[in-house]
Amino acid sequence: MPEPITQHGIKIAGENPMIILYRPGSDDIVVLVSMWTARYSPVGSGRALLIWADPDESGLGSDAPIGMYADNPELAEYVWEHFYRDYDRIRGRGIETGPPVPARFVEVSGGDRFHRISCVAATTTIELEWRDVLDYFQVTTRLTGFETSAVAGPCAAAEVRVNGVAARGEIHQPEGWFGSSAALAFAEIWREI
């Protein structure tokens, strides 16, 4: 007899790669990026970039982005309210203080060599690049009332460029369950438990 099918309420499905750059030789974060691509969410599909960069330490000065960029503003607000409520590493940096900035996104993949997402807003272009995928594996976590599963791809290198200028900073390896502070996350699903 076949096993019964169990259905669970899905809160979001898509991708969520991240980049965290540190001041060289330290644990001080200088750039923090969380890039969401929702194929499904209760507020529709789209992309939302949550980003914080220290103006001085990143070397980006007055161009250092802090905030949310989105092609679906409701998605950016939904992601912030539902998935970052207990994530101290990103909270308190001012990301949520302004409304989401309207933006367009372009994605290019070079297999295991690189993955690039460009975010273009009125006066700002933010380019995110993950390079040299080290491995792919499935990870399942239970954080903040959700079960999350994803296909993770920790990377050996990453770069964040704003208006053509590369942010200073280095990734950490190993770090967390992804093994790198620059990691791709495909087929990511969050369900409430």
Region spans (language model):
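Targeting-peptide/extracellular-domain and disordered-appendage signature
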Residues: 1-193
